[in-house]
A protein has these predicted regions:
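N-terminal Sec-pathway targeting helices
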Residues: 2-14
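Beta-strand-rich domain onsets/edges
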Residues: 17-48, 54-56, 164-200
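Short consensus segments that form the blades of beta-propeller domains
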Residues: 28, 66-69, 96-100
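A short acidic/small-residue loop/turn micro-motif
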Residues: 47, 55-56, 93-95, 124
């Protein structure tokens, strides 16, 4: 009986030790990125200079990373060069907290007179067979962190389209972590005769 109890105690100790190791190992993504891309006019294919690119990372908390909601974790912004190129640095996104996970980045791209970004030729493959579309999307994201991906911006043609696009904000990001993006949005709002976004 004592031998059985000793084995049981040893088994419980082993299981608890494994659980402790798992709990205190870093969780979430490892280093990800960098992200490289070129932004072009969807209609003409010509590069777009001066587009603001904002990358945002969020932290999910709670059991299974779902019950506690999410909050801002980090951001980086840059502006495209004369050839439309941009670069976002790699990130270490692990955390010691087993009940949180860093995810992202989500990309916000703004250039006055243009709409929301998409991967090049998305209209040709993105609305086809769901499995084909999903695989192509994964391939584009892999390319984004390898040789670089081409992103398209559609040119807006009406004031109403520009008004809708001017509300394209990363509201979860503090103003001091997206000054270029906020400046570009506020210039667009001013050109439309509207009040600027107040920093928070």
């Amino acid at each position: 009986m004592k031998k059985t109890e000793r084995r049981l105690a040893a088994g419980v100790t082993l299981i608890l030790s494994i659980l402790l190791v798992v709990l205190f190992l870093p969780t979430g993504s490892k280093a990800a990125g960098p992200w490289k891309g070129q932004i072009v006019n969807k209609e003409t294919g010509k590069p777009i200079e001066g587009a603001v690119v904002l990358a945002v990372w969020m932290k999910a908390t709670g059991i299974f990373h779902t019950t506690g909601g999410s909050e801002f974790y980090d951001s980086e912004e840059t502006v495209t060069d004369a050839e439309g190129h941009f670069f976002i640095h790699a990130r270490q996104t692990w955390t010691l907290n087993p009940f949180s996970r860093i995810y992202g980045p989500e990309f916000y791209i703004f250039k006055s007179g243009y709409g929301r970004w998409q991967f090049r030729d998305f209209d040709k493959w993105g609305l086809k067979d769901a499995m084909v579309s999903a695989e192509r999307t994964r391939a584009e994201w892999r390319r984004f962190t390898a040789e670089g991906s081409v992103l398209e911006l559609p040119q807006l043609k009406t004031r109403e389209e520009r008004l809708r696009m001017s509300s394209y904000m990363a509201y979860q990001v503090p103003a001091n972590r997206m000054p270029k993006f906020l400046e570009a949005i506020n210039k667009e709002l001013a050109s439309l005769g509207l009040q600027p976004v107040e920093p928070r």
